[in-house]
Amino acid sequence: MDIDTYKEFGASVELLSFLPSDFFPSIRDLLDTAFALHREALESPEHCSPHHTALRQAIVCWGELMNLATWVGSNLEDPASRELVVSYVNVNMGLKIRQLLWFHISCLTFGRETVLEYLVSVGVWIRTPQAYRPPNAPILSTLPETTVVRRRGRSPRRRTPSPRRRRSKSPRRRRSQSRESQC
């Protein structure tokens, strides 16, 4: 069974496969980043977002893989076989977990649309012959000027008033305090 864990987020395994394996930080660094930025949400019994849920699942999965590797290390007597299993887990499963952690941490940090745009631009950059592409690959932290990353529940601030709105020269009148606040 071939399940694409990125499908519900608008991405795919193929889209992430354009990034070389050495692009992704170590699992330890990714776990440290996830907990530094999102500890409260990850440990909360409340549902925060699909990205938080996916992060939790990836962290639990990695923990179970480490339990398996420890068990194999303790119970498999043939050193060559033991090394093969541990190497397979670290290389193949480790890469998949690193990709998952990176994707969801990046989506929470920069926004899903920005991350998807980045993955597409890196894919185009990699497939463009070297003679025709810029020397440096796109960088995720360099957000395009048109991209706006908003926090949940807050509306964007206006920089200039709407041209149709008339500005009064008189001081602003306050609404009556008798009304109860409305949320």
Curated annotation (Swiss-Prot):
Motif Bipartite nuclear localization signal per UniProt: ranges: 158-175
Region (Disordered): 143-183
GO terms (BP aspect): microtubule-dependent intracellular transport of viral material towards nucleus; symbiont entry into host cell; viral penetration into host nucleus
Consequence of substituting residue 97 to L: No effect on capsid stability
Source species, domain of life: Viruses
UniProt xrefs under Gene3D superfamilies: Viral capsid, core domain supefamily, Hepatitis B virus
Main location (coarse class): virion
Chain positions covered by the region annotation RNA binding: 177-183
PTM sites of type Phosphoserine: 155, 162, 170
Biased amino acid composition, Basic residues: 149-176
Compartments where located: Virion; Host cytoplasm
Similarity comment text for this entry: Belongs to the orthohepadnavirus core antigen family.
Binding partners and assembly: Homodimerizes, then multimerizes. Interacts with cytosol exposed regions of viral L glycoprotein present in the reticulum-to-Golgi compartment. Interacts with human FLNB. Phosphorylated form interacts with host importin alpha; this interaction depends on the exposure of the NLS, which itself depends upon genome maturation and/or phosphorylation of the capsid protein. Interacts with host NUP153.
Designated name of the protein: Capsid protein
Gene: C
